[in-house]
UniProtKB/Swiss-Prot annotation:
Keyword Membrane: yes
One Gene Ontology cellular component: exocytic vesicle
Main location group: membrane
Keywords: Membrane, Repeat
Annotated GO MF terms: calcium-dependent phospholipid binding; neurexin family protein binding; small GTPase binding
Coiled-coil intervals, chain numbering: none
Source species: Homo sapiens (Human)
InterPro entries in the record: C2_dom, C2_domain_sf, FYVE_2, Rab_BD, SYTL1-5_C2B, Znf_FYVE_PHD, Znf_RING/FYVE/PHD
Subunit record text: Monomer. Binds NRXN1. Binds RAB27A that has been activated by GTP-binding via its N-terminus.
Protein name (database record): Synaptotagmin-like protein 3
Length: 610
């Protein structure tokens, strides 16, 4: 047990100076806890993906991570030594410098322990079982300060006024007495506020901990108990921040999310400034790219009565190919939690049809307000040719307890009809929020880029005498080869850094539902890859190909065993691509028929990815 630190010998101003440092230390700890929470959330998503196995018939024959069906003789998979689950070859991650491997979940769990430092506390608990919970010096000082003070919140005392200064004039003495009375009333106000907030926090944490006990095992309940004990300290620190603005002023200047000077400057600007002043230094540039929106995109969120409007502006720089969405404010939003009259809004954007985590941008969360002010600029790197195929989705969400999301409304803007060169379209506008549509109507054919390929049906030639002898008789079709050369792709949805680790998958589906799959090598860090890779499908006849379909998909290889991102795909065959309109479907049929009708000749095609 650590020894308690005695602060009774310090003066009031010295305590406040120490308290300022403790608040900064607490802010650093909160940032570290947020980083740890994101790592554990990503690990939990991987575990949930492996748990979503509804195919009970093939329960013992599927990979425990990606649910891919395993074979009896080939591709049987292997058992992970960490979790004792059978996984396929694609769900294994080899450790650096060794031949040992782990599954994606065990490897991610190992990385989380390394990055968060949990391995150190586990080893310490083995050597010192009665060591207790880790406690920093800053936490000990905060506890000593709380026990020393009679009230939970102590505002900073003003500079001392000498009696000689007060005795010079009776007005000074009267003013000094009123100032002391005002300080006393402020102390009483923050005392009642801190006590009330602390009671609400304890009751809310007790309710969430009871729900968590029913849903999780005993191992996770221990972590929830520790988190609940930390929440009381967080509430006390938050109330102190409100009560001592002078102390926390240097801390707010260090944190860009808490800075208010740019906002005050921007409010003095006219309502419709010129485009050159809209995207100036008055806004925080950049955005947050997180990994915890998988549940919301799958429909796992709550809905509120959509009300209110959002104000933003759109600007595109043709030199840097940068699309900037400047989110200014919202008004008259609905409450995310109607019973508690609570709303913690934030804004999230996508460039449809890309809904991946790399294509998401979002602002910071504004607490307890239905009229938030964001003043943030979200950026995308998009080529001008891709703007006509994109739609900007701007949605507003409420962040509740336990990371629960509530949908508050959205705005869909087709960029094909947006005039980026007109100065009036670059000024701020209010857009009414609408409910989430079940299916977005595409005003323009959406495209994820273009894929250039060459195809040829290779058939063996017959001798002339045998061909003349078999004319007019029913003869079996010759087995040939379908050769496909994947040349390259362009206008693909790239990552935030402007690169891709792309590869192509080809799948030929025969009439008997047999599937022939091939894959190209990965080209790393190229926005416009040029593979020039050949796919050869052997043992097929022209009669089979007339009733078959060829599906080509372009993927972006993920890192650290995560799921690869689908960039787009297209389909050639008798049925065409059913995911697009009638014109594109008929075009794919004509291209497929042209390949089959001209054997032993190359046919160049440019396919649009959807």
């Amino acid at each position: 047990m650590a020894q308690e630190i005695d602060l009774s010998a310090l003066k009031e101003l010295e305590r406040e100076a120490i308290l300022q440092v403790l608040y900064r230390d607490q802010a650093v700890q909160n940032t570290e806890e947020e980083r740890t929470r994101k790592l554990k959330t990503h690990l939990q998503h991987l575990r949930w993906k492996g748990a979503k196995n509804t195919d009970w018939e093939h329960k013992e024959k599927c990979c425990a991570r990606c649910q891919q069906v395993l074979g009896f003789l080939l591709h049987r998979g292997a058992v992970c030594r960490g979790c004792s689950h059978r996984v396929c070859a694609q769900c294994r991650v080899f450790l650096r410098g060794t031949h040992a491997w782990k599954c994606t979940v065990c490897f991610e769990d190992r990385n989380v322990k390394i990055k968060t430092g949990e391995w150190f506390y586990e080893e310490r608990a083995k050597k010192f079982p009665t060591g207790g919970k880790h406690e920093t010096v800053g936490g000990q000082l905060l506890q000593s300060y709380q026990k020393l003070s009679k009230i939970s919140v102590v505002p900073p005392t003003p500079p001392p006024v000498s009696e000689s200064q007060c005795s010079r004039s009776p007005g000074r003495l009267q003013e000094f007495g009123q100032f002391r009375g005002f300080n006393k009333s402020v102390e009483n106000l923050f005392l009642s506020l801190a006590t009330h907030v602390k009671k609400l926090s304890k009751s809310q944490n007790d309710m969430t901990s009871e729900k968590h006990l029913l849903a999780t095992g005993p191992r996770q309940c221990v972590g929830q108990t520790e988190r609940r004990s930390q929440s009381d300290t967080a509430v006390n620190v938050t109330t102190r921040k409100v009560s001592a603005p002078d102390i926390l002023k240097p801390l707010n200047q260090e944190d860009p999310k808490c800075s208010t000077n740019p906002i005050l400057k921007q409010q003095n600007l006219p309502s419709s400034p010129a485009p050159s002043t809209i995207f100036s230094g008055g806004f925080r540039h950049g955005s947050l790219i997180s990994i915890d929106s998988t549940c919301t995109e799958m429909g796992n969120f709550d809905n509120a009565n959509v009300t209110g409007e959002i104000e933003f502006a759109i600007h595109y720089c043709f030199k840097t190919h940068s699309l900037e969405i400047c989110i200014k404010a919202c008004k008259n939003l609905a409450y995310g939690e109607e019973k508690k009259k609570k709303c913690n809004p934030y804004v999230k954007t996508y460039l449809l049809p890309d809904r991946s985590s790399q294509g998401k941008r979002k602002t910071g969360v504004q607490r307890n307000t239905v009229d938030p002010t964001f003043q943030e600029t979200l950026k995308y790197q998009v080529a001008p040719a891709q703007l006509v195929t994109r739609q900007l989705q701007v949605s507003v969400w409420h962040l509740g307890t336990l990371a629960r999301r509530v949908f508050l409304g959205e705005v869909i803007i087709p960029l094909a009809t947006w005039d980026f060169e007109d100065s009036t379209t670059q000024s701020f506008r209010w857009h009414p929020l609408r409910a989430k549509a079940e299916k977005y109507e595409d005003s323009v054919p959406q495209s994820n880029g273009e894929l250039t390929v060459r195809a040829k049906l290779v058939l063996p030639s017959r001798p002339r005498k045998l061909q003349e002898a078999q004319e007019g008789t029913d003869q079996p079709s010759l087995h040939g080869q379908l050769c496909l050369v994947v040349l390259g792709a362009k206008n693909l949805p790239v990552r935030p850094d402007g690169t891709l680790n792309s590869f192509v998958k080809g799948c030929l589906t025969l009439p008997d539902q047999q599937k022939l799959r091939l894959k190209s090598p990965v080209l790393r860090k190229q926005a416009c890859p040029q593979w020039k890779h050949s796919f050869v499908f052997s043992g097929v006849t022209p009669a089979q190909l007339r009733q078959s379909s060829l599906e080509l998909t372009v993927w972006d290889q993920a890192l650290f065993g995560m799921n690869d991102r689908l960039l787009g795909g297209t389909r050639l065959g008798s049925k065409g691509d059913t995911a697009v309109g009638g014109d594109a479907c008929s075009l794919s049929k004509l291209q497929w028929q042209k390949v089959l009708s001209s054997p032993n000749l190359w046919t160049d095609m440019t396919l649009v990815l959807h």
